[in-house]
């Protein structure tokens, strides 16, 4: 799909991307898929993008970007929201799946940071997908050799729709946006996703919006708002 778009928009433009982008994309998609087997839509999104935020803020700090007390307070508040969500208890999500989702968030944070230097979002996204293909084929071969999952027609159609629209086109758009904002802005922008995912889970999947998830979401988004309201120093 991306190759077709690339040929239509820029017939003479070659593919971009890198093996680093392909690796980050593969790890994100694989870990994300494994983790969501046992996590609800809202919980998974909150853990995922909380990890994304921490990854990108840490990168910005290592690169020499200094933050005000308000930004640091917002980061700590958002992190506290994630801790609140994962505290042991009857309403706590599975810890192993949550940790896998956090690793997926680190991979997506790395993928987003790699996109900050992208001047050709569509070409780079298409190239990154191609670079991830060998790893995907190895994973598919492993599933075939082992006791692979049963694949139905509806599952294939959902996967195609997700890959073409949400992943292919969506990632290209994100690469076009992320290069125009700072690392901390990119990180905080993405934390609106858990709220959307939670509402979608309740509306489309019949999931229950627990009090713990609701409170954790408010704390995380409050931290994001606090961080965004501060000026960089």
Predicted regions and their residues:
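Hydrophobic transmembrane alpha-helices of multi-pass small-molecule transport proteins
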Residues: 1-5, 25, 67-87, 104, ...
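Transmembrane alpha-helical segments that form core, pore/gating elements
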Residues: 1-5, 55-57, 90-146, 173
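Hydrophobic transmembrane alpha-helices of multi-pass small-molecule transporters
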Residues: 1-6, 29, 53-60, 82, ...
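Specific transmembrane alpha-helical segments of multi-pass solute transporters/efflux pumps
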Residues: 9-49, 55-57, 77-80, 84, ...
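Juxtamembrane helix-entry segments on the extracytoplasmic side of multipass membrane proteins
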Residues: 14-15, 87-107, 142-161, 208-218
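Cytoplasmic-side transmembrane-helix entry/capping segments in multi-pass membrane proteins
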Residues: 14-23, 64-79, 98, 120-131, ...
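Hydrophobic/aromatic residues within transmembrane alpha-helices
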Residues: 35, 61-67, 118, 124, ...
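Helix-helix packing/entry segments at the starts of transmembrane helices
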Residues: 44-51, 114-134, 167-203
């Amino acid at each position: 799909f991306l190759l077709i778009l690339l040929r239509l928009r820029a017939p003479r433009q070659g593919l971009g991307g890198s093996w680093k982008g392909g690796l980050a994309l593969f790890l994100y998609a694989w870990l994300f898929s494994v983790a969501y087997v046992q996590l609800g839509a809202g919980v998974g999104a909150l853990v995922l993008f909380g990890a994304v935020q921490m990854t990108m803020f840490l990168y910005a700090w290592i690169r020499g970007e200094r933050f005000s007390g308000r930004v640091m307070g917002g980061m700590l508040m958002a992190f506290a929201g994630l801790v609140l969500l994962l505290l042991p208890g009857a309403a706590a999500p599975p810890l192993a799946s949550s940790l896998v989702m956090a690793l997926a968030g680190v991979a997506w944070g790395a993928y987003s940071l790699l996109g900050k230097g992208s001047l050709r979002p569509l070409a780079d996204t298409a190239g990154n997908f191609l670079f991830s293909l060998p790893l995907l084929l190895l994973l598919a071969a492993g599933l075939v050799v082992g006791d692979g999952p049963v694949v139905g027609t509806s599952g294939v159609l959902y996967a195609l729709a997700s890959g073409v629209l949400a992943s292919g086109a969506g990632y290209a758009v994100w690469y076009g946006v992320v290069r125009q904002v700072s690392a901390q802005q990119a990180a905080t922008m993405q934390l609106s996703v858990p709220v959307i995912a939670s509402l979608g889970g309740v509306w489309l999947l019949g999931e229950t919006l627990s009090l713990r998830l609701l409170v954790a979401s408010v704390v995380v988004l409050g931290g994001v708002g606090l961080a965004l309201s501060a000026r960089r120093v």
